Structures are given as structure tokens and as C-alpha cells.
Regions:
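Beta-rich, blade/repeat-based domains predominating
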Residues: 245-257, 289-304, 335-354, 385-402, ...
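Structural motif
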Residues: 35-44, 77
Length: 553
């Protein structure tokens, strides 16, 4: 089990960049400045400082530098009274807790921190996994948990192994987008698969060994990750609150007009956010399978700029015309429908090549193809890994420039490439064993970039060489969900467990990791290339907000 010192080295050693690189940069006018310090440590680098104006739906955050100094650009803070908050694991805000910002002047707030009395409450999922005793194979069983809830729900429980097994059985009957506030039961014989009974029992016994079922305190030390350093502190983060706490923005993307569009994982709406005004609009999708769970996942665009939505257990897909603000839907043919029919992902990106939209049916691991012009569906069925005759259970399904399809095999290490003309599948294996490719994108050079969820890495498949290259993330237990490249050739991903946004320079192998102000459960990632530097966007799936990350370089 890695020590805290090892965690520090793994992360800090990769992201530190000399501050002299930025010394010549002109400083923008500031609305609020100050220094963060504690009695024990003096000035503190890498503390996320957040400011939220009274009555506003926006929270602006910056990060303290190596002298403990922080600065909010004047362009980001309007005049008014602001509530202050911090994120620095192991510390709480001592004061001040508010600041008054006036037009044309710079306010000052020197922030004092004190040691926290409840470290466990501050730990990220990644820090919990680093803290747990046991083998990595045992810890990885918990990677299936954090899609629905944080690990502290498990860790602070007093369930014994038998009670965990009972809880698992109940959970298999709930829709993936269920929350404690908005539970949805699956219908009929649809169930989520937990695997063989022996594995379920072993997982239950492991969880009962790390929670509070045996004692009132944990019998292992709690380990923390280091705070950001150097270049990772040069960032401004904006969080836009959504109007209802039950909104789960799963996929968030930005169109050419600067409007953010997002899917609701637990409701049948398409949402939009105008970052300039903070206005949120919701467009209800039609119900096409009454009585079944509602919620949407994948959000993609076609060449004409139309938005396409995967409708999950509603058993179909939808297209939204932004000009007319109307939906068109296509339901999977009745003969292929079951209680478990689930359209989580679709790919219209290059449908202009052959007029076909790829759609995944998670039930039975089927690949479908839709002709929107005629409404006709094809069922290409499930595909096998010929080396072991195992079914490829794809997660993301991005398409290349010729509308050939990639199958990211979430239960193994495979990347399958499906020829759109012949229907033949070629399988490629990532060097990291059981890497569990999840979601990804094809770049301008027709290369596939993808997240290796269990491999804790970014992968890139080059179809010319037919080779896969990998870059392991510097933060242990980051478990990336998705990857996208920007106009500069850098690759971006985010952690479902550590609340860090990772930026990779593939030429040098260097990472920069930006710590977000709150628990975020990062899923789909998007980069807006119209800005310089580029801007990163993500939906806070468990936090009912949209997050914008603006690096200063």
C-alpha cells in the first residue's frame, strides 16, 4: 500500500513547473486578493479559495501560489458581498468568511486556516482507496460504486457482510441514474449485474472490514493527496448552479454560440446554460416507453449542429433541432425491446459520410445502426473476442472519420474497430492488463483517444501503426472516465474519484492537474477551442452544477 510520501511524489513530481516561466506575464486587475496561511505552516500554496456573491448562482475559485497569495480577476467578481470558502484537505477556514468587493478598487482578505477536526469528511474517493488496507484487486471492486454515490456512504456505515449482500441485492433493481433523493426502480426482470455470487460475498466481506461495523473508528491511517503546486495553481474555476438539486448533468458540451448543453441522467430533459447570463432552460423530451425509468446519458452533435441524445431505458434516441426547439425520436424496434433495453451511447458525429447513426444497446451488448432518413434500424448483434470467445461489452462507441466504429471494451483491455462497410471487427489490446477502456474521442488526425478507467491512464490508438500508447495519470486512484484533445494537441481528462482535471502534453509526457473546489464525479469532458487558452467544461453529475475551468496558460 503506497505511503503518503509516495502519493506526494507521484503527484507533485509530475506537475511542478518553474514559476519563472510566468514571471513576465502581465497581471490583470484584481477585485480581491489576499494570502492564505496557517499557524503551523505559514503561507500555503495550492489552497482553492472560492467566492460566491450573495444571491448569485455563480461561484468563482482561484488557487494560492507558492507564497500563499491568491487573486481574483476584476472581470470575474461583480461588486457586492461575497461568502468565502476553501478547499485544502486537513484544514478548515478560520476566517474571514466574507469579503466586500467594490467597483474600481481591490479588496483584501488574508485567510487563516486551522487544522480540521473531521479529516474523514474531507477525503476524496481516491484518498479513501489509498487509505484502505488490502490488495488493489480488492479496492478495485469499489470502482463500480462511485458512479451512484461517494465511498463515505459505505465507509461510515455499520453493515456487516450479510447486510452488505442484502444491500447489493436491493441496488441491482435500481436505474443507474437513481439517487437517494430521486430513486427509480427498474421494470420487470431488468437487473444490474454484480457478477458471480462468490465475488459478491468477497466484496461484502471486504467492505465490512474497512467500514465501522467492528469499531467506532477506523483502524487504519487516513491518507491525503498533496495540494496543487506551480502551474496547477494558475487557473480560474467557475461553477454555475442549476435550478434544482435533483438535476444530474451527465454530458455537457458547448456549441458554436457559446451555449452549454447538457443531458439529465435522472430526468427526461435536455438542458441549456447561457454562461453570460446564468440562464438555464430545460426542454422536455417525449416519453417513448411509458412506465420505464427516465433519464439520458450521451450527448453528441452531427455535422449540421443538431444535438443527439441517448435516452437510456426509454429504448431509443432523439435529435434536437436548436432552431425550432423540437425533438425527433426513433424507438428501437419492438422485436429487439426487453425490460433491460438501454441506449446509453450513440454516434452521429460522422453520419454525413454514409447517412448512418451508430447506437449501442447495453442489453445483450448489441451494436445497432439507424438510418434517420428512413427510420430503419439494423442490428449487427454482439461481437466476440476471437482469442477467448468472450463477448465484447463496449461502453463508449466513438466513430472515426469514415464512420467506422470503435468499441471500448469496459470489461477487458480491448479496443474493437468495426468496419462500417464489411461489418468485420478487429480487436486491439492495450498494454495495461484489464485497463477497462471507457469513453473517448477521435482527433483531427483520426487517432482514437480514450480513458482507461481501471488502468488509471490515457490511451491513444493510432490506426496507421495499429499501436496503442498509454500515459498513466500521476494521481493514484484517479480512474479517468473520458478523454478529449484540444487544438494544441494536449489531451484532457478528469477523475471520477479525486476531483482533479488532468491535462497531458503527449510530446513530453507532462501532466498538469487542477483541483476542483468541490466533489464533482467527473464524467464526460469537453474542451472549448474557441478560447485562448482553451477552456475545459464538465457537468457535476452529483452536484447539480456546470463547471468551467480556465487555465491561465
Amino acid at each position: 500500500m503506497p505511503s503518503r510520501n509516495l502519493l506526494l511524489a507521484l503527484t507533485a513530481g509530475v506537475i511542478v513547473v518553474g514559476l519563472s516561466v510566468f514571471a513576465a506575464r502581465a497581471q490583470a486587475p484584481a477585485a480581491l486578493t489576499g494570502q492564505v496561511s496557517s499557524a503551523a505552516d505559514g503561507p500555503m500554496e495550492g489552497v482553492v479559495v472560492s467566492a460566491k456573491r450573495d444571491g448569485s448562482t455563480l461561484t468563482i475559485s482561484v488557487v494560492s501560489d507558492n507564497a500563499g497569495k491568491f487573486s481574483f480577476p476584476a472581470s470575474k467578481l461583480e461588486p457586492g458581498r461575497y461568502s468565502l470558502a476553501i478547499r485544502a484537505v486537513g484544514y478548515d477556514l478560520g476566517g474571514p468568511k466574507t469579503a466586500d468587493v467594490a467597483a474600481g478598487s481591490t479588496a483584501t482578505a488574508d485567510i487563516k486556516l486551522r487544522p480540521t477536526r473531521n479529516l474523514a469528511k474531507q477525503l476524496t474517493n481516491a484518498e479513501w482507496l489509498a487509505s484502505f488496507p488490502g490488495a488493489d484487486t480488492q479496492k478495485k471492486t469499489l470502482l463500480n460504486c462511485i458512479g451512484c454515490h461517494d465511498l463515505d456512504r459505505i465507509i461510515t456505515s455499520t453493515h456487516d457482510a450479510d447486510e452488505f449482500v442484502q444491500a447489493f441485492d436491493r441496488m441491482t433493481g435500481y436505474y443507474p441514474g437513481s439517487t437517494p433523493q430521486h430513486p427509480q426502480r427498474l421494470i420487470g426482470d431488468a437487473r444490474r449485474n454484480l457478477g458471480a455470487a462468490a465475488g459478491v460475498k468477497a466484496m461484502a466481506e471486504y467492505l465490512a472490514s474497512v467500514n465501522l461495523s467492528r469499531d467506532e473508528v477506523w483502524d487504519y491511517p487516513l491518507k491525503t493527496l498533496p495540494r496543487p503546486q506551480g502551474r496547477a495553481t494558475r487557473v480560474v474555476i467557475t461553477e454555475y448552479d442549476l435550478p434544482r438539486k435533483q438535476i444530474q448533468p451527465h454530458d455537457a458540451i458547448v456549441d458554436s454560440d457559446g451555449i452549454v448543453w447538457f443531458t439529465h441522467f435522472g430526468e427526461l430533459f435536455l438542458g441549456s446554460l447561457d454562461p453570460k447570463t446564468g440562464k438555464v432552460s430545460e426542454y422536455p423530451l417525449p416519453v417513448i416507453k411509458p412506465g420505464y425509468p427516465i433519464g439520458t446519458l450521451d450527448l453528441e452533435t452531427d455535422q449540421a449542429g443538431n444535438l443527439w441524445i441517448a435516452m437510456m431505458y426509454q429504448g431509443g434516441v432523439a435529435k434536437f433541432d436548436k432552431k425550432t426547439e423540437t425533438f425527433q425520436t426513433w424507438r428501437v424496434p419492438q422485436q429487439w425491446q426487453t425490460d433491460a433495453t438501454q441506449q446509453a451511447f450513440l454516434t452521429p458525429t460522422n453520419s454525413h459520410v454514409d447517412g448512418k447513426v451508430w447506437v449501442k444497446n447495453s442489453d445483450r451488448a448489441q451494436i445497432l445502426r439507424l438510418d434517420p432518413a428512413t427510420g430503419e434500424w439494423e442490428n449487427l448483434g454482439a461481437f466476440k473476442d476471437t482469442s477467448n470467445n468472450r463477448t465484447i461489452t463496449s461502453y463508449g462507441i466513438p466513430a472515426d472519420h469514415d464512420n467506422n466504429l470503435y468499441l471500448l471494451d469496459f470489461s477487458s483491455s480491448n479496443i474493437g474497430k468495426l468496419d462500417a462497410k464489411t461489418g468485420n471487427l478487429t480487436v486491439y489490446r492495450s498494454p495495461i492488463a484489464n485497463s477497462r477502456p471507457r469513453r473517448g474521442r477521435v482527433d483531427e488526425h483520426n487517432r482514437l483517444w480514450f480513458a482507461e478507467y481501471a488502468g488509471n491512464a490515457i490511451g491513444m490508438f493510432d490506426p496507421k501503426s495499429e499501436k496503442i500508447e498509454e500515459w498513466v495519470l500521476p494521481t493514484p486512484w484517479a480512474q479517468p472516465y473520458d478523454v478529449v484533445t484540444d487544438k494544441n494537441g494536449e489531451a484532457w481528462t478528469g477523475s471520477m474519484l479525486s476531483d482533479r482535471v488532468s491535462r497531458l502534453n503527449p510530446k513530453t509526457g507532462e501532466f498538469v492537474e487542477y483541483l476542483l473546489p468541490k466533489t464533482t464525479n467527473i464524467r464526460r469532458v469537453f474542451v472549448d477551442n474557441s478560447t485562448t487558452p482553451v477552456t475545459f467544461w464538465v457537468g457535476s453529475n452529483h452536484g447539480a452544477s456546470i463547471v468551467k475551468v480556465e487555465p491561465m496558460d
